[in-house]
């Protein structure tokens, strides 16, 4: 997983999933990024948690370059109701 800081990165949403419970809304976004410096597409995940009091978010960049794997990881994350605080720990276990 890389941190993408290049201002010329192009992003495109692949899939989004939102689930709401009593006091929290979790939104999962799978997206592709294409960096101008190498032009290769990579897949990244964002998890956002919204409550009445705050919004927190975590993004894991460049988790894979294969669409099939990205969708599989995305579905595992959404089924497990992963939060922004646990995103990197969970990805570390499944990657």
List where the protein language model places each region.
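Intrinsic disorder/low-complexity signal
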Residues: 10-14, 49, 61
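Negatively charged, low-complexity tracts enriched in Asp/Glu with abundant Ser/Thr
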Residues: 1-31
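A short, structured beta-strand/loop element
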Residues: 37-59
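A positively charged, amphipathic N-terminal helix/segment that binds anionic biomolecules
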Residues: 22-38, 88, 93
């Amino acid at each position: 997983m890389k941190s993408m800081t290049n201002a010329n990165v192009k992003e495109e949403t692949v899939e989004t999933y939102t689930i709401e419970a009593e006091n929290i809304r979790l939104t999962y976004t799978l997206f592709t990024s294409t960096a101008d410096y190498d032009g290769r597409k990579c897949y990244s995940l964002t998890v956002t948690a919204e409550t009445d009091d705050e919004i927190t978010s975590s993004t894991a960049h460049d988790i894979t370059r294969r669409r099939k794997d990205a969708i599989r990881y995305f579905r595992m994350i959404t089924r497990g109701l992963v939060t922004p605080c646990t995103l990197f720990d969970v990805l570390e276990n499944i990657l």
